[in-house]
Amino acid sequence: GDFLDETAFMVNALAGGSDTHDIADDVMRELHFLERLEPDLVFLGNHDERAYMLLDHHKQEVKFAAQGVVDDIERLVKGELKAELVPYSGVTGGGTWSKKSFRALGNSMAFCHGFTYGLGAGEKHCLFTGMSTVFVHTHCIEVRPVRSLGDAYGYNIGFIGDVEKMHYASRREKTMTWANGWASGEYGD
């Protein structure tokens, strides 16, 4: 998730109060990255969801731009890559967190973009899924054991963005904990 930044679709940017980035450049570069990666499973994150949330916007030019981004995402992921596009629901998706937003690997490991943040985010994700969970939502790297009868861990794997280009987060103390990371490996249940 969050393969697109979509800073131009943030509420503050739409109101003209933020330094916006070129949405076309963002989409072109990031979809090219996905194309080279060739995943068979793509999670939408809260950044990617910005375009989907604007499909019913009251300004036609915003709605039109958002529809173009959504069409480009779905054309690449579902069409060219033949990959599954996993929706992002966050904690408010339909009123509650949705199982549609994660994929389980066996009976003990879940993957999701993520939806909760702060200290203990890894543990919170595991409590929601009922198993060890790998996520990226907070942009930090952390492995956290979960207080449970099972042997669950929350794996927060960081992100692959450029922190220096994320101006909207430059004044947040939490941004100092952001780190680049990538997870890969083999799994046996």
Question: Which stretches of residues belong to each language-model region?
Answer:
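Core catalytic region of metal-dependent phosphoesterases/phosphodiesterases
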Residues: 1-80
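Conserved beta-sheet core of the metallophosphoesterase superfamily
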Residues: 108-188
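Feature recognizes metal-dependent phosphohydrolase scaffolds
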Residues: 3-16, 21, 35-41, 97-100, ...
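A structural signal for short, well-ordered beta-strand segments and their strand-loop junctions
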Residues: 39-45, 93, 111, 134-135
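Metallo-beta-lactamase
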Residues: 64-108
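Generic detector of short, locally flexible boundary/turn motifs and exposed helical patches
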Residues: 8-12, 67-70, 97-101, 118-122, ...
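A short, terminal or domain-edge coil/loop segment
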Residues: 46-59, 92-108, 143-151
